[in-house]
Structures are given as C-alpha cells and as structure tokens.
Design a protein with these regions (language model features):
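Thiamine diphosphate
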Residues: 1-164, 169, ...
Length: 312
C-alpha cells in the first residue's frame, strides 16, 4: 500500500499565498515575527515589497491590516491562533469586525497539536471567540487541498475571515476529482444511516477511520466535513440529523462554543436529536508530542471510536 501523503496546513497556507500573490497584486501579507513558523516566509521571499513584518506586536498588526484594507488592498494577517484570537481579540473585534473591513486572518498552530509549546500556546478557544464577532467567517481546513482552496475563497470573499491552520502534518483526504470547496458549505465524505459524525480540521481523517471501524460492526456512520464553523451549513446539518437521529461532533477545540456548540445551537432550534460533543472537555492542554496529546485527549481514531461507542 502506498504511503498516504501528509502535509501541515500551515505549509499549505504559505504556498497558497504565493500562488495568489502571482495573480493578485493587491494581496499583502503581514506577520508578527513568525514568518518561518507561519510559513509566510516564502511569500516574503517572492514578494518582499508586499510583506510587512510587524514584530512581536499582534495587536498593532491587526490595526495595520485594518488600515491597509481601507485602501482597497487585501491584507492577510498571520500569526499563531493564540495571538490572533486571544491577544489581539479587541483589535480584531473593534478595528476589523466593527467596520466590516476586508481583512483575512491566517491563524496557525491552533489546538493541542501545537505539541511541546504547551498550554499557553495551544489555543482551543479561537472558534468560540471569533464566532461571536458579527460578520466574521470562521473556518478550519482538513488537509492541504482544502487549505489552499480556503485561502483562495477567503481572498474572493468580501469581509473579514478567520482561518485556523495546523502545525502537524495531516493526511490528504480531499483528492476526489469531484471535490469542490465553498465557504459555508459542508461536504459529505461518507454516507450512513445510523448516526452522523461532523468534524473539521485534523479531526476529519481520524473520524473517517472511526467510521470505518464502526462499519465493521454493522454501524453505518455518515461523515460530514464542516470546514466552515460560521456560517454553519445548517441545511446539511439539519438534514443529516433528521436522517440518522444521532449526531457526534469532533473538533480540536473546546467542546464549548466551537463546532459542537454551533451544531447544538442549530439542532436545538431546528431538529432536536441526541448530540455527543468530542473535543477538549473544558481543560487546558499540556506539553508533549502532538500525536501523544491527540491520543491522550481522545482525538485519535481509537479515541473517537471509543467515545462514539459509549454514546450509541
């Protein structure tokens, strides 16, 4: 069997910016002294006149990005998720969101898969924070292909967009020739009638593995990739809930306020069914190898399978 291709979505982000930069001279990239880590360094090398290093000053970077957006250019502000959504929340809210400016935020190193950097850098609250900002699109790709498509879609979208990218290399799963990406539109990756698994980011691949394991036992799970947390594809979520009668959400984020929260809010009003939220259960992360942490917090295929079995 050939080895599955893996690539970190932060690398996909950097590569996508370079390709977009070749086509659009109004694209400007900002970073906060993290060009190597966020992979925006390759854009800096290709287009030095359109790259701004703001130093370790994320709040200022968001203000600068907002100012650039008022000139008609399309700024992509890049830093770790903890600093983009956490440290600079006020500036994102007031300088970007409130005036509805066309700023794109590329937040890398999200979730516990940041690994050894530990709890202070493992942002598991960013979806929740960004969802509360009116008009903000919030998205998280599952692989290289989706990440590149998401960056291009973010450029085309008029308005603020928050995208979370990962440090850990993840399998390419969206290599279907019929694959089409659109912000706000989920993708059914596997059909099933017994329950629905809704996942995003690096949790999509292990959710598919868990579904395959369940199928061996006669349980057919529909698997949906909801890459856009806001706006949520409510039509798809409601239809799946009505069809299967049970829903499980899986995310590398707190179970409070993220994908699970968005799905529960939707279903509570439009299709009440039992829901199990799998994610970071109201705790902080810790320092350790990314793969080991995903296993400890139940976000690997075995952990997801075990929690679904207990639920059904």
């Amino acid at each position: 069997m050939s080895e599955v291709k893996k690539i970190a979505t932060r690398a996909s982000y950097g590569n996508a910016l370079v390709e977009l930069g070749k086509k659009h001279d109004d694209l400007v990239v900002l970073d906060a002294d993290l060009a190597a880590a966020t992979q925006t360094g390759i854009f800096k090398k290709a287009f030095p006149e359109r790259h701004i290093d703001c130093g370790i000053a994320e709040c200022n970077m968001m203000g600068i990005a907002a100012g650039i957006a008022t000139t008609g250019k399309v700024p992509f502000a890049s830093t770790f998720a903890m600093f983009a959504a956490g440290r600079a929340f006020e500036q994102v809210r007031n300088s970007v969101g409130y005036p509805k400016l066309n700023v794109k935020i590329g937040a890398t190193h999200g979730g516990i898969s940041v690994g050894e950097d530990g709890a202070t850098h493992q942002c598991c609250e960013d979806f929740a924070l960004m969802r509360t900002i009116p008009g903000m699109v919030v998205a998280c790709p599952s692989d290289d292909i989706e990440a590149k498509a998401m960056v291009e879609a973010a450029y085309e979208h008029v308005g603020p967009v928050y995208m979370r990218f990962g440090r850990l290399a993840v399998p390419v799963i969206n290599d279907n020739p019929d694959y089409k990406f659109a912000l706000g539109k989920g993708i059914v990756l596997r059909e099933g009638k017994d329950l629905t698994i809704i996942a995003n980011g690096l949790c999509v691949a292990p959710s598919l593995e868990a579904a395959a394991k369940l199928a061996e036992e006669g349980v057919e799970a529909k698997v949906i990739n909801i890459h856009t947390i806001k706006p949520l594809d409510e039509e798809l979520v409601v239809a799946a809930a009505k069809e299967t009668g049970k829903v499980v959400t899986v995310e590398e984020h707190s179970i409070i306020g993220g994908l699970g929260g968005a799905v529960c809010e939707c279903l509570a009003e439009k299709a009440p069914v039992p829901v199990k939220r799998i994610g970071i259960n109201d705790v902080y992360g810790e320092s350790g190898p990314a793969v080991a942490l995903l296993e400890k917090y139940g976000l690997d295929a075995a952990g997801i399978y075990k929690q679904i079995k207990a639920f059904i």
